[in-house]
Swiss-Prot record:
Species for this entry: Schizosaccharomyces pombe (strain 972 / ATCC 24843)
PTM sites of type Phosphoserine: 200
Enzyme Commission code(s) on record: 2.3.2.27
Pathway it works in: Protein modification; protein ubiquitination
GO BP, one annotated term: protein ubiquitination
UniProt GO MF annotations: phosphatidylinositol-3-phosphate binding; ubiquitin protein ligase activity; zinc ion binding
Name by which UniProt lists this protein: Putative E3 ubiquitin-protein ligase C36B7.05c
Entries under CDD domains matching the protein: mRING-CH-C4HC2H_ZNRF
Coiled coil spans: none
Length: 279
């Protein structure tokens, strides 16, 4: 079933407009579906999710959702989104009454999304979150530098985990990491920020903007998190598990556990944001 944008709460519509487009994953950057892991072949073709920008097979990317043009991921080799894909919906836009924000009167487009993004859109619609959101596999703090090693955490202990993307800004103080010359300097900065500021972010407004953000990934057989416990369900992580990595603190939880946690109204990570609840 396609996501019906006419039921998006006003706050979510505004957040979708404010969310920057995800980076487009090039065809040669993935030989398999980012969801089921099936290899791409002549018969199993590549399909891009227009919200997270990642590559999927047809079975994992056959839903559609209406999104603002500003948040649609596009092929960098294409100059523009085809005009015949634009949708002007007066009934949908009629609920946006903020005259001070011209971006509310924006073109919306019906695009293909993956199963994970469709699920996240459904959850966000139900929660009516007042904070910026991100896609299930990407966020506006990542770049297309592949096979980088970044610092992550399971529970309270920092671990090293290979991820396809690297932060371009510190998830704690939001300082640009491009100012650091080496990867080790970036890792050291993030580790220090997590150690010194995990309980007192730069300001609460900025914290709330980032507290719920996460990316979804599947654990491999070599993941350093294997055997450690998800502190929500107390079950050990196993190869093949779908997990959520929190942007702010880099903690990792089972994806379903974290989504269930968010549905209670929690502001974010159970470890670092357990005392914050939505009003």
């Amino acid at each position: 079933m396609d996501e019906d944008e006419t039921t998006y709460p006003e706050a979510l519509r505004r957040l979708l407009i404010e969310t920057p487009a995800a980076i487009w994953q090039l065809d040669d950057e993935s030989a398999q579906c980012n969801n089921c892991g099936g290899p791409f072949t002549w018969f199993r073709r590549r399909h891009h999710c227009r919200w997270c920008g990642k590559l999927f097979c047809y079975n994992c990317c056959n839903s559609f959702a209406k999104l603002p043009v500003s948040s649609v991921s596009v092929d960098p080799t294409e100059d523009l989104i085809p005009q015949d894909m634009f949708i002007r919906d007066p009934d949908f836009l009629a609920n946006d009454n903020d005259d001070d924000n011209d971006s509310q009167d924006s073109s919306w487009i019906n695009v293909r999304v993956c199963v994970n993004c469709r699920q996240q859109l459904s959850e966000l619609k139900e929660l009516d979150l007042p904070y910026p959101i991100t896609t299930c596999l990407n966020d506006d703090t990542t770049t297309r530098s592949n096979n980088q090693v970044i610092q992550s955490s399971c529970g309270n202990n920092l671990q090293r985990i290979e991820e396809p993307d690297d932060f371009v800004e510190c998830p704690v103080c939001y300082a640009p990491l491009s100012s650091f010359k080496t990867l080790s300097e970036r890792e050291s900065h993030v580790a220090n920020c997590l150690s010194n500021n995990s309980s007192s972010p730069r300001n609460m407004t900025e914290f709330l903007k980032h507290a719920r953000r996460y990316i979804s990934m599947q654990l491999s057989e070599t993941s350093p998190c294997l055997g450690q416990e998800c502190i929500i369900c107390f079950e050990e992580f196993a190869a093949g598990d779908r997990v959520a990595r929190i942007e702010y603190c880099l903690c990792i939880f089972h994806l379903k556990c974290y989504r269930d946690w968010l549905s209670t109204g929690a502001a974010g990570c159970p470890v670092h944001a357990a005392t914050l609840h939505l009003s």
